[in-house]
């Protein structure tokens, strides 16, 4: 379902609504030894470096019908990466764009060791958070993406692409609309599209793989959906190890530990 492209409301002046999508995914992995844990973090750090994240966010920008004005990206030591993209709803002439903006030109980005930029009402950001504890056999990886737009552009249009771009065991999605615009008669409009649930914008085949629940505050235009993977195929959660190397009893124990970790992350509570 595309928003902001069809059945347009007749507005007076600029559409001043700000639409923000906050998208967090968690990937969980069994890594028993310290070596496995460090190897997993190194793998994730390489797999989701700032260059790949930049490509994902540029695709998101195209999908929501916006245009790149500026890219700021950075890889961190010992791990993690961040990317921020300033976007505009309409194409701007080069002479109209602030000289501090790089228009996402790769040759400009490659001439700098550290790249910084500025934010605007319309922007796309991503941060990564690999994590493990030496006393725990489970490592996790979180990706935090924010897409904030003003005008007719809606970040919900890129939701399925974002979900498909990452291996996600737990997904939390927040969507809110702020501000107001006016119709031609001067009546305030606090939202310019119909929505009852974020799940309405998620592919059915994706939803079948997850248990999903909503917490919505309709009068405040706040929508929240969180999703937990239904089936655990153990081989997908082992790092540098074959499932058949593990005894059946230990397999069951590992699956239980993985599920407990996922449930706590999903609920946001220390349960076990």
From Swiss-Prot:
Keywords: Autocatalytic cleavage, Decarboxylase, Lyase, Polyamine biosynthesis, Pyruvate, S-adenosyl-L-methionine, Schiff base, Spermidine biosynthesis, Zymogen. Its EC number is 4.1.1.50. Coiled coil: none annotated. Pathway: Amine and polyamine biosynthesis; S-adenosylmethioninamine biosynthesis; S-adenosylmethioninamine from S-adenosyl-L-methionine: step 1/1. Pfam families: AdoMet_dc. GO terms for molecular function: adenosylmethionine decarboxylase activity. The record marks 121-122 as: Cleavage (non-hydrolytic). The modification Pyruvic acid (Ser) is found at residue 122. The active site is at 122 (schiff-base intermediate with substrate), 127 (proton acceptor), 150 (proton donor). GO terms for cellular component: cytosol. Catalyzes the decarboxylation of S-adenosylmethionine to S-adenosylmethioninamine (dcAdoMet), the propylamine donor required for the synthesis of the polyamines spermine and spermidine from the diamine putrescine. Heterooctamer of four alpha and four beta chains arranged as a tetramer of alpha/beta heterodimers. This is S-adenosylmethionine decarboxylase proenzyme. It comes from Clostridium botulinum (strain Eklund 17B / Type B). The lineage of its organism: Bacteria, Bacillati, Bacillota, Clostridia, Eubacteriales. The gene is speD.
């Amino acid at each position: 379902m595309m928003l902001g492209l069809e059945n347009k409301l007749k507005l007076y002046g600029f559409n001043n609504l700000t639409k923000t999508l906050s998208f967090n995914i968690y990937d969980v992995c069994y890594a028993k030894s310290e070596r496995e844990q460090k190897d997993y973090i190194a793998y994730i750090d390489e797999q989701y470096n700032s260059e790949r994240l930049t490509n994902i966010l540029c695709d998101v920008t195209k999908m929501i019908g916006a245009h790149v004005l500026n890219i700021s990206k950075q890889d961190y030591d010992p791990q993690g990466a961040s990317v921020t993209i300033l976007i505009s709803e309409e194409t701007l002439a080069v002479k109209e764009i602030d000289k501090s903006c790089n228009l996402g030109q790769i040759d400009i980005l490659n001439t700098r060791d550290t790249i910084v930029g500025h934010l605007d009402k319309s922007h796309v950001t991503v941060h990564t958070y690999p994590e493990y504890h030496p006393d725990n056999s489970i490592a996790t990886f979180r990706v935090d993406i924010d897409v904030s737009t003003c005008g007719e552009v809606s970040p919900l249009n890129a939701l399925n692409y974002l979900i498909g771009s990452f291996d996600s065991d737990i997904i939390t999605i927040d969507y809110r609309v702020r501000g107001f615009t006016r119709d031609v008669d001067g009546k305030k409009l606090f939202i310019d599209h119909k929505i009852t649930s974020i799940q309405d914008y998620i592919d059915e085949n994706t939803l079948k793989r997850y248990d999903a629940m909503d917490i919505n505050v309709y009068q405040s235009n706040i929508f929240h959906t969180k999703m937990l993977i239904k089936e655990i195929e153990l081989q997908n959660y082992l790092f540098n190890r074959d499932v058949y190397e593990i005894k059946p009893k230990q397999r069951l124990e590992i699956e239980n530990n993985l599920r407990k970790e996922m449930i706590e992350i999903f609920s946001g509570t220390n349960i076990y």
